[in-house]
Amino acid sequence: ARCASCHQMSASSPVGTDNRFHNVGVSARHQEFEKLANTALEILAKNASKEELDRLALETDISELGRFVVTRNPSDIGAFKTSQVRNVGVTAPYMHDGSMATLWDVIDHYNKGGEANRYLDGGIEPLNLSEAEVTELVAFLFTLTDDRFANSNRAEMDRQRQLAAQRRPFRDEDVASRKVLPFEPRATGKR
């Protein structure tokens, strides 16, 4: 599913991150990036203090611009650091803004290719995973948790499974059931 493109694991780096910044289409659900970026640039041009930048990052929508606030590089709009997957089973909620309650939500988000936006990382494309494959991938992710957290991990998997059975806000039913190809809505402009 191309997860290892960003969540790299090796003997020297067993936590599963490339330590880079990517726009994976999370912030795009909430923001008009260009307008927000222009507002941020106006504020940054006034040489805002470190305290003011911290306040903006913590208390305003400017935080959704991600790395751009630091670099001012448009290619960094909406880009956030790749999180590690070690112990991912016990670290909910997920994504930079905590907007995804379960690992099912995370995989559903990636399965449909994130939220389209002009700054979306080029590696983020629909995955075309079936429901069974989504469930298998989630189960695999729970295996990445250290044995010291085994009890918490089992309880969290059960909790997330129950939540996912009730509500899957990021799931695309047509893609998951393979009624449409995952790229069809983007290619045709139809939903």
Task: For the regions a language model picked out, list residue spans one by one.
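Short acidic/polar inter-strand loop motif in beta-rich domains
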Residues: 145-148
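Short glycine/threonine-rich turn/loop motifs
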Residues: 1-100, 105-108, 115-118, 152-191
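C-terminal soluble interaction/assembly domains
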Residues: 114-129, 136
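Solvent-exposed, acidic/flexible segments
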Residues: 78, 100, 127-130, 134
